[in-house]
From Swiss-Prot:
Pathway: Protein modification; protein ubiquitination
Domain (Cullin neddylation) ranges: 666-728
Subunit structure: Component of the Clr4 methyltransferase complex (ClrC) composed of at least clr4, rik1, pcu4, rbx1, raf1 and raf2. The cullin pcu4, rik1, raf1, raf2 and the ring-box protein rbx1 are components of an E3 ubiquitin ligase, whose activity is essential for heterochromatin assembly.
Protein name: Cullin-4
Record function comment: Required, indirectly, for activation of ribonucleotide reductase through the degradation of the protein spd1, thereby supplying deoxyribonucleotides for DNA replication and repair. Also has a role as a scaffold for assembling ubiquitin ligases. Component of the Clr4 methyltransferase complex (ClrC) which contributes to the establishment of heterochromatin by specifically methylating histone H3 to form H3K9me. ClrC preferentially ubiquitylates H3K14 and ClrC-mediated H3 ubiquitination promotes clr4 methyltransferase activity for the methylation of H3K9.
Coiled-coil parts of chain: none
Chief location bin: cytoplasm
Length: 734
């Protein structure tokens, strides 16, 4: 068995006296807490005794005196908030104005004082707060009690709340007006509103009204005073400023409604003015302002309101360009520059907005194909001419920019052109000249562009063009074969002949000329050789396309003249003249057998241009039958080989007319062929359906007029390919 435990006896212990001492301690501690709370709530602070008070609250809480402590605490906090309320109310009434920012300062001051006093209370009553109040739902924590008292006993008082809110809003308005404002007390005020749960229900609605009123007034003034691009800068900076205020003053939860309010005032209210301003930015080539405008509209999903002004602006600018005949020389460069700028705007300023990109493409199609009168076909013609210039000059014409990039930009324009057959006709004429007269700067560039056209338009579009290149290459091989044959041994001079297939090349007028005997013998020799190799074929000579290198001995020096065959034949007539003798116009006409038009043009190029190997006597713009021509004995030039261009009298206008006529004829044939194909397949069709079907079939090469389709139908009716039944129904005749 374990030993018996010893009993300890406390002598003189009296339970009744112990309880009395406890009660005395509780009363004493309660009195001290009352005194301490009274001092704290009066704002006098406690110098010492924190530890004793803290221990006293802990002991009271452990002794189930927490409810008693809470009642004391609640009483003194209520008294304390009453003191602050009376102080604030009396000061605000003394100031006598609701909009004075002092009201906000006073309330924020009360709030900061209250926080300081509550912090002391929390330190003293920490144990009770954490072990009793936090675990009893019927009791608020000290923080909950303090916030509730401040909200209900101070902020709910109308004599304080209304002046405070008006004062706070005035402070924010001063802040927006760039007036001096203490940011720190505004931050304290916002913290107070958040913690007292008055932010959303009381402050935000009034703040939005203030913002609306402020920006409505300011934006209406700014839109009148500032240039539009500066107004956009102002609007964007205002939105960025509001975002900064939202973060700084902890208004993040209402950022969306604040931004929508500001955007409505700055953007939506002036939407018509702003969107129409796009025309100013386009004319000034101001991509930055376009970017600002789009960004501002995008905030409220209002970019759709930019589509029509954007489209109208592009069409207006485009029509000004294409309808101005005086701008023909620079039209393509201006269109390229305009298109490149707009592409930058769409890609960078409008963030690849597909709707605005589509509107841009439709605008280009509208003005490029909708010019007035003779300018209607100008873009197609001038693009072909500009390409010709680039291919003749090379990269020097593009300022050193790779031609592949330039061609790509040109083809972007080319895609908008409806009359691609017009472009093809001019391009075909120009490429023929470059190939036949060896005027192309680079065969590689020619083939590169041809490949790009093929990818853009298809092989049918480039079929004839590819045939032209094949003819030139075959001619090189054939001429080389001729030069190495026995037939070439008796040639009087070096000869190169291009043998062309009529199906691929433009049609040229047959201009007659009587060649010098030795020249004619050389051509006859080549023709005989060619026909011996190509049985069943026939050769037709086009002297107007010929060119020569002629060696000339002038008194001031020997030269080589790069000239046309017509010019060469005229100059060679002067080999028979003795010193100082001349030849009359009439004699030259007789010896060369040139027509008056060709001879006049040739003589003008030799005697009236900048480079003049001949002298006309008497001088005139147009020679008469008696006009005399002499060798220019003072002729000189810094170059040994001198290029003398032919003078084309009104040829460009005539060429344009000829091309137009040829295109019209080709279109009629193409329309008739398309109608026959359609009717052969359908057998019967209504008039309107047939017209629309045919237009859709041929639109890739050019959109025909409805009247042209009707004309083609009438011709097929005359040729009895079609029959017309009642109700405008056509039947195909097999």
């Amino acid at each position: 068995m374990p030993p018996e435990a010893k009993r300890i006896v406390v002598k003189g212990f009296d339970p009744r006296k112990s309880r009395q001492r406890q009660e005395t301690y509780y009363v004493t501690m309660i009195d001290r807490l009352n005194m301490a709370l009274q001092v704290v709530m009066a704002g006098l602070g406690l110098k010492t005794g924190y530890q004793e008070l803290y221990s006293g609250v802990e002991n009271l809480t452990r002794a189930d005196q927490a409810s008693r402590c809470f009642n004391i605490l609640q009483h003194h906090m209520s008294s304390g908030i009453q003191l602050l309320k009376d102080s604030a109310e009396s000061f605000i009434q003394l100031e006598g104005t609701e909009t004075d920012t002092n009201a906000c300062t006073v309330v924020v001051g009360c709030w900061n004082k209250w926080l300081e006093r509550v912090e002391i209370v929390q330190n003293i009553f920490y144990y009770m707060d954490k072990t009793f109040l936090s675990h009893h739902p019927d009791y608020p924590t000290i923080e909950e009690l303090s916030l509730s008292l401040f909200r209900e006993k101070l902020m709910a008082v109308k004599n304080i709340q209304i002046p405070f809110l008006n004062s706070l809003l005035q402070s924010f308005e001063n802040l927006h007006s760039s007036k001096s404002t203490d940011h720190a007390y505004l931050q304290d005020a916002m913290l107070m509103l958040h913690r007292t749960e008055m932010y959303s229900s009381v402050f935000v609605p009034m703040y939005l009204v203030m913002l609306s009123r402020f920006y409505d007034t300011e934006s209406s003034q700014k839109i009148q005073e500032l240039p539009l691009e500066e107004y956009l800068e102002y609007a964007m900076s205002s939105l960025e400023r509001e975002d900064a205020y939202v973060e700084k003053f902890d208004i993040v939860r209402d950022k969306k409604s604040i931004r929508e309010t500001v955007q409505r005032c700055l953007i939506t209210s002036h939407l018509d003015t702003l969107t129409k301003g796009i025309s100013q930015f386009i004319e000034k080539r101001d991509a930055h302002s376009c970017k600002l405008l789009y960004a501002l509209l995008q905030f409220n999903h209002e970019t759709e309101y930019l589509i029509q002004p954007w489209s109208d602006c592009l069409v207006d600018v485009g029509f000004k360009l294409v309808n101005d005949e005086s701008k023909d020389d620079t039209l393509v460069q201006e269109l390229l520059s305009f298109h490149k700028f707009l592409q930058v705007v769409v890609d960078e300023s409008f963030l690849h907005d597909e709707t605005l990109s589509y509107a841009m493409r439709k605008a280009f199609e509208t003005f490029i194909n909708g010019a007035k009168g003779s300018q209607r076909e100008a873009p197609a013609r001038l693009i072909a001419k500009y390409i010709d210039y680039l291919l003749r000059v090379g990269e020097q014409a593009s300022g050193g920019k790779p031609l592949k990039e330039v061609f790509s930009e040109i083809l972007d324009l080319f895609r908008y052109i409806a009359s691609k057959d017009i472009f093809e006709a001019y391009y075909k004429l120009d490429i023929a000249k470059r190939l036949l007269l060896n005027k192309s700067a680079s065969a590689q560039n020619e083939l590169m562009l041809l490949d790009m056209l093929k990818k853009t338009c298809g092989s049918q579009f480039t079929h004839s063009l590819e045939g032209m290149f094949r003819d030139v290459n075959i001619s090189k091989e054939f001429t080389s074969s001729f030069r190495h044959s026995k037939a070439a041994h008796n040639l009087h001079r070096d000869l190169y002949v291009n043998v062309l297939s009529q199906a691929y090349w433009p049609s040229y007028p047959e201009s007659h000329i009587r060649l010098p005997d030795d020249m004619q013998q050389d051509l006859d020799c080549f023709e005989k050789f060619y026909l011996s190799k190509q049985v069943g074929k026939k050769i037709s000579w086009y002297a107007s396309l010929g060119h020569c290198i002629v060696k000339a001995r002038f008194p001031l020096g020997n030269k080589e003249l790069s000239i046309s065959l017509f010019q060469a034949c005229v100059l060679l007539q002067f080999n028979n003249c003795l010193g100082g003798e001349g030849i009359s116009y009439q004699d030259l006409k007789k010896s060369t057998e040139l027509s008056d038009i060709d001879l006049t043009r040739t003589l003008q190029s030799l005697s009236c241009a900048r480079i003049r190997p001949l002298v006309m006597v008497p001088k005139s713009k147009k020679p008469s039958p008696d006009t005399m021509f002499y060798v220019n004995e003072k002729f000189t030039d810094k170059l040994y080989r001198v290029k003398i261009n032919q003078i084309y009298l009104k040829e460009e206008r005539q060429e344009n007319s000829d091309v137009q006529e040829q295109v019209v004829r080709d279109r009629q044939f193409e329309l008739q062929a398309s109608i026959v194909r359609v009717m052969k397949q359908k057998e019967k069709m209504k008039h309107d359906d047939l017209v629309q079907y045919v237009i859709n079939n041929v639109k890739d090469r050019g959109i025909p007029l409805v009247s042209d389709v009707k004309t083609a139908i009438e011709k097929l009716l005359e040729k009895e390919y079609l029959e017309r039944e009642d109700n405008d129904i056509y039947t195909y005749v097999t």
